[in-house]
């Protein structure tokens, strides 16, 4: 369309024709009406006038970018918490736009002024929803009152070519009297832009002359009328963009200064707005944001905001209106959700989640925002610390302890590492360690009372009360080794047990019952060797009376004293049998004196302990001994119920190859029958067979009767309590519970011991002798392991890798191969396959039947592992009689051997006035001209010292050697 008249040119520029006519007249073009023709020269004059009014081209945009990095912790699919690095990049562009472009929820200022008069009329302009494909970016402003640049151009000038669409300066209002209003507009726009996730927040300030004030441009005006209003001006050859930039008359310098100040104030307000989003985020309530829109520069407070107009009236195709609606809704949703989900607490807001540029373009920003909001909710799940009461059982794994405290197992492991204990997640902790960890986490630790199935046993015992009847006494024979305990019992039993025992010493605890003329007596024979302390303690625990056997020719020995202590600890009365009185060297009076020193006072001295002189060889005094024992039993009035389920004590236990686990039981109360379900420690079973001490089958056994039973699931520990239960299922449950409890406690103790030994042996060259011990009975295993472990020293440590009852099997040899151990068999032998495997792999198998033989050989092996001792031995003394200095050789000493011998490989010590001057080696030794290996006393020789030429007449050389001597334990 050709712009031939003023009206057509005004239509092309989309501005009122009368405004354009006024600007043409101000440019010096003589036109009378809007129907007059406009030439190219007229357009050039108008363009030149507008350029003079505005000055040089200024930047049209401010681009602000921000990049923030934060960390969030989020659980993955496996439940593990992972730290994720989140980088948020946001960009915001402030653009000076044309008045014809859509305004983003902001009122535009349209003011116009005459070339000389500064007053400005104001009216909010409605945003026009222009099609996106319309190629008319260079649309002129409606009017320019003063040449005032926007704060965006002041803050960051970006000169661009004139034809560019964004190069047209946004015409700001040049109001010398009201610069603060522009600042108010910017602040209002900033308040609107903060909660909205919009990348391009564009500011628009337009101007208009007083003439169009009468035009209807109120907020109620529709966008269509606003769009059709400036459409009646013909095109000319001059570029519309240039005409638009020059569409205002020149202004005085004073007005430019005022405009510059206003622009600086607006730029300061913009900077303040950029630094304000963090404060906005801390206030989740949306009320302050709504209040910021209540009173603006162009509208009094209380009226509906102009931002609502684009949401309702703008075309759906207008991108500005659509984006404004979406972002406003999303922003309000976030604000409401934040206010609803996040109560007011003292935690600071996380500024990396939301912000003045929080959103993105299109759907991406919303999706990212939702994910960030979920992360925020995930963080809120972590609650404050709550102190709990933690019930800690005897043993507990690290994982279970962490679960009880509601923390991760890794935190418990870290805490244990701080306490100096290296553990894994499945490792079992003892109760003491677990309680320390619980207290370290700030909880209260309580020793738990487990759901113990053994409580059932107490209930059973309470129910089975019955009338007690007299029972036979249980007598334990104690004393030092070789004092004649077993021989005394042999005479009483009319049997020969001692002659059949290895080495003539008792190594098992034996139980027998003997029928005498005055009644039945049950005897327990205990070992006297020092290794069997635990066995003697068990014997004293199970007994009613103790016979203390003391040899009349030997007196009180260490194990005699130990037996006295066991008897006193158990509160058991003593009867002293002074044995071997038939020997010529017997001295019973000395024995009495020594026992009085141990607080065992005989009756004849005013005490309460009967002393009976006996001889196991001739039988003298045996009847008096039994009479005293039965007298003590009558005083004690021993009774026990008979018609109740049996209870007893495991005296000894072993693994028999043909019969399985065999236990020697002393029945203490009730009656034990064949077929009863029994529980002994961690083993249970049904009694399949019962044998007396002579090996005969019996069906029942009453109180104080020792029997051997078969049918247990495994070998019980000596000293365990045995009881009969009515329910086999209950017996199995209790046995399994005890097994797990014992295993857990053992593992926890082992771990603590390993840690202690690891720190003790750190940096030391400690040798370790590994042993695997297999014995015939449980008591021997216990005694042997205890004796061998006591042999450990600072340099050599005995480590019992495995100890069990039974023969040496192939699995034992395999364990010895893996641990490089020596296998010790005590009264047992190896299987044929185990022998072959041991020979093939060079494993040392040792068999013993006397306990102190095993102890002595292990001690000898440990001695061989000790580092040899180095000793210095002086072998000769040499005196220097002459000193020669020879070139290329050094100082040669002519010497006389005064004592001993001098060897060429010996070490020497140089003495001067009996003070050591030097210690080293001989370099050469000669007699006359010949090299010799040694020179004996009384002969002279010549010698040189290695590395020392300081020799004088009268010096002495002490010749010595270092010898290694094997050490013993």
Curated annotation (Swiss-Prot):
What are the GO MF terms of this UniProt record?
Answer: GTP binding; GTPase activity; guanosine tetraphosphate binding; translation initiation factor activity
Q: Where is this region: G5?
A: 615-617
For region Disordered, the annotated ranges are 96-377
Q: Does the keyword DNA repair apply?
A: no
What the entry lists under Gene3D superfamilies is as follows: P-loop containing nucleotide triphosphate hydrolases, Putative DNA-binding domain, N-terminal subdomain of bacterial translation initiation factor IF2, Translation factors, Translation initiation factor IF- 2, domain 3
User: What segment(s) does the record annotate as region G4?
Assistant: 579-582
Chief place where the protein resides:
cytoplasm
- The record's region (G2) falls at 504-508
Give the superkingdom in one word: Bacteria
InterPro entries named among the record's database cross-references: DNA-bd_dom_put_sf, EF-G-like_DII, EFTu-like_2, IF2_assoc_dom_bac, IF2_II, IF2_N, P-loop_NTPase, Small_GTP-bd
Which portions of the chain have biased composition (kind: Low complexity)? 105-157, 167-181, 216-252
Which parts of the sequence are annotated with region: G3?
525-528
Start and end residues of each stretch annotated as G1: 479-486
Question: Is Protein biosynthesis there in the keyword field?
Answer: yes
Q: Which residues form the tr-type G domain?
A: 470-637
> Which family is it part of?
Belongs to the TRAFAC class translation factor GTPase superfamily. Classic translation factor GTPase family. IF-2 subfamily.
The record describes the protein's role as: One of the essential components for the initiation of protein synthesis. Protects formylmethionyl-tRNA from spontaneous hydrolysis and promotes its binding to the 30S ribosomal subunits. Also involved in the hydrolysis of GTP during the formation of the 70S ribosomal complex.
State what protein this is by name. Translation initiation factor IF-2
